[in-house]
């Protein structure tokens, strides 16, 4: 698994992810890039879960973004609608965190779309650790979204054996 964290603060949204790819209890790769920019660099996305399933989610989501001119929420909802008709999509073992200037969302391999209550979201095996760390930093410091995402990912990597310290970080200022 992995850890992906997204933090939004002061007209900046950041998605950060570690680089570990595991097969069972074995580390297969330590420098994978699980965070990327989509739709003319206006949307950030990160994935956790099975790599093949995550790429399927990425591909489907990116096509929805193109179809709906980069409108994040509409694209996510339209992707979720596909779950009702496409048997292949129904059991993907992956999750996406996506964000643009207006919203941050979780898209699950079960077809759920969730908008987080706070200005942060974290998924993956180290997601709970990263979320707790990020929430504490959001509530008790003036750190930037970038600094909070980086520090919370470091903390998750110190605790979760399926998360390492290699980081890919993308930020969007608006």
UniProtKB/Swiss-Prot annotation:
CC annotations in GO: cytoplasm; HslUV protease complex; proteasome core complex
Regulation: Allosterically activated by HslU binding.
Primary localization: cytoplasm
Keyword field contains Ribonucleoprotein: no
EC number: 3.4.25.2
Keyword entries, A-Z: Allosteric enzyme, Cytoplasm, Hydrolase, Metal-binding, Protease, Sodium, Threonine protease
Active-site feature positions: 2
One GO molecular-function entry: threonine-type endopeptidase activity
Binding sites annotated in the UniProt record for Na(+): 157, 160, 163
GO BP annotation list: proteolysis involved in protein catabolic process
Subcellular location(s) per record: Cytoplasm
Function of the protein: Protease subunit of a proteasome-like degradation complex believed to be a general protein degrading machinery.
Quaternary structure and partners: A double ring-shaped homohexamer of HslV is capped on each side by a ring-shaped HslU homohexamer. The assembly of the HslU/HslV complex is dependent on binding of ATP.
Protein family: Belongs to the peptidase T1B family. HslV subfamily.
HAMAP family: HslV
Name this protein carries in UniProt: ATP-dependent protease subunit HslV
Organism of provenance: Shewanella oneidensis (strain ATCC 700550 / JCM 31522 / CIP 106686 / LMG 19005 / NCIMB 14063 / MR-1)
């Amino acid at each position: 698994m992995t850890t992906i964290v997204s933090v939004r603060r002061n007209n900046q949204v950041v998605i950060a992810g570690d680089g570990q790819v595991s097969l069972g209890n074995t580390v297969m790769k330590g420098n994978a890039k699980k965070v990327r920019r989509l739709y003319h660099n206006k949307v950030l996305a990160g994935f956790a879960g099975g790599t093949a399933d995550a790429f399927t989610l990425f591909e489907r989501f990116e096509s929805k973004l193109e179809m709906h001119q980069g409108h994040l929420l509409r694209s996510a909802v339209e992707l979720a609608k596909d779950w009702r008709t496409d048997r292949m999509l129904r059991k993907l073992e992956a999750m996406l965190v996506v964000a643009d200037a207006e919203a941050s969302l979780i898209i699950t391999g079960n077809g759920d779309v969730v908008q987080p209550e706070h200005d942060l979201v974290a998924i993956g095996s180290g997601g709970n650790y990263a979320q707790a760390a990020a929430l504490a930093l959001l509530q008790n410091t003036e750190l930037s979204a970038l600094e909070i995402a980086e520090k919370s990912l470091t903390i998750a990597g110190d605790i979760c054996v399926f998360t390492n310290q290699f980081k890919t970080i993308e930020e969007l200022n608006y």
